[in-house]
């Protein structure tokens, strides 16, 4: 199907601007066909850096090939960027390294909507991309940043999971911090990764471990970063 028809299936109005919240394929995979339909692509500068070259992600045991020219962001920024569209102000802000080194938040100012990208997974364990700057400590730091930026009325859009609110951000931070503390203690006591995977997150596994990030994989990333 032509890209224009695909875009029209999303919105009758033309899409003029596409924002990438970070470089991963599940957040940039539509770049080329949305660009073909007339949109320009905006991202943090590290997103373009990773998309321009073959990028290895050890956590997935996969090397992602460089993106085609039409998928490369044409406008990039370092720390902050403000965009005005449809009578709305969008405030973009780069995080310190968290899920990756390219993560940004997008605040829809007038609507009080806050999009976190993959610095927030609502009731799902997150993937942490150590190969491109991510870490469990960075993910927790970003969670703290997100909590500080919203009110009880803010609508929070995660990178994965259902739309949430401040309480969900707090829960996510607490789950990550609790897992990190338990894993760090076990690692300091000399426990191996295999031993650590034996259920320090059992309390949250039933609800949080049903996404593509299993409890074992999540604990592997936590263990790596402690």
Model-based region annotation:
Residues 1-7, 104-108, 112-118:
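Conserved beta-strand hairpin/beta-sheet module of binuclear metal-dependent hydrolase folds
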Residues 16-24, 42-45, 114-117, 149-150, ...:
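Active-site neighborhood of phospho(di)ester-bond hydrolases with catalytic His/Asp-centered motifs
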Residues 113, 137-191, 195:
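Divalent-metal (often Zn2+) His-rich catalytic cores of metallo-beta-lactamase-fold enzymes
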């Amino acid at each position: 199907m032509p890209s224009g028809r695909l875009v029209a299936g999303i919105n009758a109005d033309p899409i003029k601007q596409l924002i990438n919240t970070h470089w991963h394929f599940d957040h940039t995979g539509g770049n080329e066909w949305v660009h073909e339909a007339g949109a320009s692509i905006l991202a943090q500068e590290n997103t373009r850096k990773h998309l321009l070259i073959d990028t290895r992600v050890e956590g997935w045991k996969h090397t992602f090939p460089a993106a085609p020219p039409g998928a490369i962001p044409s406008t990039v920024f370092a720390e902050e960027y403000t965009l005005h569209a449809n009578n709305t102000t969008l405030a973009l802000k780069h995080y310190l390294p968290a899920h990756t080194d390219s993560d940004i938040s997008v605040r829809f100012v007038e609507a009080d909507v806050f999009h976190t990208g993959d610095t927030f997974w609502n009731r799902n364990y997150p993937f942490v991309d150590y190969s491109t700057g991510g870490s469990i400590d960075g993910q927790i730091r970003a969670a703290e940043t997100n909590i500080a930026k919203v009110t009880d009325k803010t609508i929070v859009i995660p990178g994965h999971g259902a739309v949430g609110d401040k309480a969900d951000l707090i829960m996510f931070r607490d789950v990550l911090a609790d897992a990190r503390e338990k894993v760090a203690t076990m690692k300091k006591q000399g426990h191996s990764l295999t031993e650590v995977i034996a259920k320090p997150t059992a309390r949250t596994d039933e609800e949080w471990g049903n996404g593509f990030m299993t409890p074992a994989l999540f604990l592997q990333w936590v263990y790596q970063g402690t």
